[in-house]
């Protein structure tokens, strides 16, 4: 068993928390068994003084079974 790490950017129009969830959900689409997430950075787009898009740069760790059956 190896653990691999992927860097992703999650986005949300609601919150940074939802941006992190978005990144995790996207990573899970590949069938990866996610074991953890590390938030590296938060940013936001601002228009007319309001935050309109939240972004979270994350590292997602997942199990790599190298062709072995998952249990």
For the regions a language model picked out, list residue spans one by one.
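Short, well-ordered alpha-helical segments
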Residues: 1-37
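A cross-kingdom feature marking charged/low-complexity
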Residues: 42-71
């Amino acid at each position: 068993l190896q653990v691999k790490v992927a860097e992703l950017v999650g986005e949300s129009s609601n919150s940074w928390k939802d941006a992190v969830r978005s990144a995790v959900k996207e990573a899970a689409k590949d069938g990866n068994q996610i074991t953890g997430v590390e938030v590296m950075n938060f940013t936001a787009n601002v228009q007319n003084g309001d935050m309109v898009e939240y972004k979270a740069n994350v590292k997602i760790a997942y199990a790599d079974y190298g062709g072995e059956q998952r249990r």
